[in-house]
From Swiss-Prot:
Function (record text): Binds to DNA and alters its conformation. May be involved in regulation of gene expression, nucleoid organization and DNA protection.
Coiled coil regions, renumbered to chain: none
One GO CC annotation: cytosol
Protein name, entry field: Nucleoid-associated protein LCABL_24440
Domain of life according to the entry: Bacteria
Family named by the database record: Belongs to the YbaB/EbfC family.
Gene3D superfamilies per the UniProt record, alphabetical: Nucleoid-associated protein YbaB-like domain
Record keywords: Cytoplasm, DNA-binding
PANTHER family in the record: NUCLEOID-ASSOCIATED PROTEIN YBAB
Amino acid sequence: MGNMQGMMKQMQKMQKEMQAAQRELYATEFEGKSASDMVTVKFTGEKIMKDIQIKPEAIDPDDPDMLQDLIIEAVNQAMGTIDKETQDKMGKYTRGLPM
């Protein structure tokens, strides 16, 4: 019976650590930039966009596709960083668990 209580305490501790890591991750701000820093985006760890900065020279009325590509590049970079950081922080808690 004592072994079961020990396991429960260990699981509760792990759950608290996991929640703290998740709160820290969600509070972190992640940035993504396009080529030449023409577009910069900022996201929370929950993948909520908080800011976008576009340099005036990125806005060419004759080439809207360029601006779209720059935004996509910056957003994808930020999302990749968030995903990597999430895996680094949370992966230790989910390793070995059936999904």
